[in-house]
């Protein structure tokens, strides 16, 4: 049975899940939040690019518009970045810039239709693999802020921004917070 599931998942373009459930528990699986089966899921292919090289900027711009509900600034792609992590169908991405302080996660986005699929966690695991120490910011009203709180080692709350960090030495936290507060907006 696992071989059949593997073949099925290999032939679909996006991440997809298959639930294996006992027939007696089928209704519970369908109609409750706490399912009764075992979920088997194919992961997404995440491409890692140095800088903006080989990134389809138009598709990335569309992803940001879908995820954030507003357009990215025209000069966003002229800013230097160290690495971009992009799901093969541009349903999710992360952008990391090098700063004088530490790596800065400037964008982390999953398109609205893919939110809840685990894609963000897949991208996040690659970012944290490549960057064990970095910082980022989020608007207080951002719905993902509570997830960020679980991922960070620390945070400071300001009226306009919440500043998060992970793996930073204590002497770097102050300069990282100052950098994040001073960074210009990515949206027009």
What is each of the regions a protein language model found here?
Residues 136-138:
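Conserved hydrophobic beta-strand within the GNAT/NAT acetyltransferase core sheet
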Residues 140-163:
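Conserved active-site alpha-helix within GNAT-family acetyltransferase domains
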Residues 1-102, 106-121, 125-126, 130-134, ...:
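C-terminal catalytic "cap/lid" subdomain
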């Amino acid at each position: 049975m696992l071989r059949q599931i593997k073949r099925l998942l290999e032939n679909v373009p996006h991440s997809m899940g298959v639930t294996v459930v006992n027939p007696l528990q089928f209704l519970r699986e369908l109609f409750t939040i706490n399912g009764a089966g075992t979920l088997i899921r194919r992961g997404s292919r995440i491409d890692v690019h140095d800088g903006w090289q080989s990134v389809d900027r138009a598709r990335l711009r569309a992803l940001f518009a879908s995820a954030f509900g507003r357009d990215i600034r025209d000069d966003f792609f002229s800013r230097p970045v160290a690495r971009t992590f992009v799901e093969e169908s541009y349903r999710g991405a992360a952008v990391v810039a090098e700063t004088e302080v530490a790596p800065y996660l400037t964008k982390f986005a999953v398109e609205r239709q893919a939110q809840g699929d685990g894609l963000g966690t897949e991208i996040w695991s690659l970012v944290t693999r490549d960057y064990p120490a970095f910082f980022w910011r989020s608007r207080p009203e951002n719905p993902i802020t509570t997830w960020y709180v679980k991922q960070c080692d620390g945070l400071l709350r300001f009226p306009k921004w919440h500043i998060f960090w992970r793996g930073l030495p204590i002497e770097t936290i102050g300069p990282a917070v100052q950098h994040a507060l001073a960074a210009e907006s990515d949206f027009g």
